[in-house]
Structures are given as structure tokens and as C-alpha cells.
Amino acid sequence: MSIDNIKKLTETLNRVEDNLHEEKGILEFILEHTTDGYWDWDLTSNYQYLSPKLKKQLGYTEDEMENKPESWQSICDKLDLEKTEKRIEDHLDGITEDFKSVMNFTHKDGHIIKILCRGKVVKRDENNQPLRMIGTHTIIL
């Protein structure tokens, strides 16, 4: 490999790094200035990160709600939960392109809150098995 090729490769890598840094800044701005909560689910370990805004939507602090699906499932309306689990399963199986469900939750203070949950599998293994799914929670007024 010549020195010119190394210089061109270095310039390309620097541009890619600059673009990634810019995209990260945009994403951080959006997440900071939106009222939506978000979640990130590692399907292999069943760890589901629940953002502080998502927990706040439901009336909880960061420490009051564990990062696992059971945390939100336990306060979701049972019929909505059944419908939602079916939609998640359909999406994980590749039947649907993405996942959407409207759910009623019992807020920590006791009132009902309606939330639109949207998500998508963003990582699959070599056998097309889902590994990671991410999504958002939007309060419906």
C-alpha cells in the first residue's frame, strides 16, 4: 500500500468519524428535547433499558423501576398486554416490519395513562433470530 493510499484512507476514516460524531450530537439533542421515552431490549439476556423519561411518564424515578420487561408489563392493562405480546411476537418472527401498540398503563399515582409504543428489531444473528429491539413510548393525550 502506497503512502498516497494510506493518506486517502486516513482522510476517509476522519470524514466518517466526523459524520458519526455529528449524527451522535443530533441524536442526543433529539432525545434530550423530546417528551418521548425510549427502550432498548437485549433479547438474549432479557435486559431492557428503560429511559428515565419513559419511567417518568409512568410516575417512577430511575431507581424505582427495574430495567426489564416485567417492570412495565406489571402495570399494563392485561388485555392490552396480551395484544401487545402478540404484536411483539409477530414482529420478532419477521411477520411485521415494525411493532406498534397502544397500551393503557396504571401510573404510579393510580390514574390511567395511554401510551403508543413503537419498536423494531435492529439486530439479528446469522440464523435471522432477533438479538436486539429498540423503541419509543409516546403519551397519547
Predicted feature residues:
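A sequence-level detector of short linear motifs
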Residues: 49-50, 114, 132, 139
